[in-house]
Amino acid sequence: MNSFFKSLRSSSSRELDHPRVTTTLSKQGADIVVHNPSANHNNKEVLQRAMDSSKGKILMNNTGTSSLGTYESDQISESESYDLSARMIVDTNHHISSWKNDLFVGNGDKAATKIIKIHPTWDSRKQYMMISRIVIWICPTIADPDGKLAVALIDPNKSVNARTVLKGQGSIKDPICFVFYLNWSIPKVNNTSENCVQLHLLCDQVYKKDVSFASVMYSWTKEFCDSPRADLDKSCMIIPINRAIRAKSQAFIEACKLIIPKGNSEKQIRRQLAELSANLEKSVEEEENVTDNKIEISFDNEI
């Protein structure tokens, strides 16, 4: 008997937290309107609670009635004080990809080319994905490089003359970083090896064919969403990297890797922050205990 009353209390509390709302349709002229009558609760608060229990960030917008599409040539709209974007949750789980390592190889006296397909794993049930940022870092691996470099973001589905979406130019004399900011999302059906966006690299460095003259590392940020997104701007930022900047110890490198924690649980992030702190302390100790072991080279005893 006690268990019976407990179940009644638990069910009533669930109804208070997530009350049922009856949705009705009515036709007003050529339009079909969706009515969500308010019960003894606030619709926005219910929606907010439902979103707060999900992972990801919430995009709220209170601009008024939203178009839901058409049904049998009639326009369907929703008579709510919030629009569809209020229901869109951007899933940021595992959204930063790991660094991919590749090589840029020579082509003899001809310009060297390389194509990288940006084809992320679709590890979400949501129907749209936005690759909001692509970072590509190119570092020369030979002495005295002098090649000019061009990196272009290509949409292979456009006409030949319109395929270049963004482009940046520089030199491989020093390490260089290109950051592409994208402003559109793609449906799941388009995320294929044939249809995905590509990075095209072109360098006029003269080097033996099929022998590497530079290292290419790249990564991207992806965000999944239920509705398609279209941001305002797209751009390419070029960042030359000073040769004097280098990691002095393995501990420092490990600390840098942990600056952006992976995962969402508190336990995961706390563990990674503890490792970050430990590696930074170890790096400082190593730097303080460094002895000068440089080998002196001279031409006094030439043979």
UniProtKB/Swiss-Prot annotation:
<keyword id="KW-0916">Viral movement protein</keyword>
<dbReference type="InterPro" id="IPR000603">
    <property type="entry name" value="MPV"/>
</dbReference>
<feature type="compositionally biased region" description="Polar residues">
    <location>
        <begin position="60"/>
        <end position="72"/>
    </location>
</feature>
<comment type="function">
    <text>Viral movemement protein which is responsible for cell-to cell spread of viral genome. Increases the size exclusion limit (SEL) of plasmodesmata by forming tubules structures, thereby allowing viral ribonucleocapsids to spread directly to neighboring cells.</text>
</comment>
<dbReference type="GO" id="GO:0046740">
    <property type="term" value="P:transport of virus in host, cell to cell"/>
</dbReference>
<dbReference type="InterPro" id="IPR006889">
    <property type="entry name" value="Bunya_NSM"/>
</dbReference>
<keyword id="KW-1031">Host cell junction</keyword>
<keyword id="KW-0945">Host-virus interaction</keyword>
<protein>
    <recommendedName>
        <fullName>Movement protein</fullName>
    </recommendedName>
</protein>
<feature type="region of interest" description="Disordered">
    <location>
        <begin position="1"/>
        <end position="20"/>
    </location>
</feature>
<feature type="region of interest" description="Disordered">
    <location>
        <begin position="52"/>
        <end position="72"/>
    </location>
</feature>
<dbReference type="Pfam" id="PF00803">
    <property type="entry name" value="3A"/>
</dbReference>
<dbReference type="GO" id="GO:0044219">
    <property type="term" value="C:host cell plasmodesma"/>
</dbReference>
<keyword id="KW-0813">Transport</keyword>
<comment type="subunit">
    <text>Oligomerizes to form tubule structures through host plasmodesma. Interacts with host A.thaliana At4g26020 protein, which is involved in antra- and inter-cellular trafficking.</text>
</comment>
<comment type="similarity">
    <text>Belongs to the tospovirus movement protein family.</text>
</comment>
<feature type="compositionally biased region" description="Low complexity">
    <location>
        <begin position="1"/>
        <end position="11"/>
    </location>
</feature>
